[in-house]
């Protein structure tokens, strides 16, 4: 059985939320989408995501909200992310960080794992484990539990994101780069059948 997963670029502020409100329902219907992921870390004015905007996105049809280095820019997210499994933060944050970095969902009978990882370059206020080693370790644990694995890699440099794509080629279904808010025109299927794009852009404007 085939499934269709829609991964929306970073939702930025009010324009991004409005774009989702006006278009997501029809897009899901037109493209027969089974599951919707959105990078929501810029939903609240471009700087983090607050509880109310997270709730709003989920009500508008988003199934899973991912984040990046701005996960905890809004203090209320420290508590809220621990109680809502539909929001994930980078899996390579330090042990003990509130929330989770992995979400396993059953979509039309197929178990799919979604992982978010954060790159090491140019995020000075974060203390991160190596995302490449982290990805390998997580995938090793999940490979017998899930039929597909999708990775969001939130990183500043093209080199980091393309390295992750090659590192995981053949091990996961997709590696989706985020952070720059600029859609790249390099979507492709890697030699070992992993789908990837360096950056999937944004919804709205910053």
Which residue stretches match the model-derived regions?
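Acidic, metal/ion-coordinating pockets
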Residues: 1-206
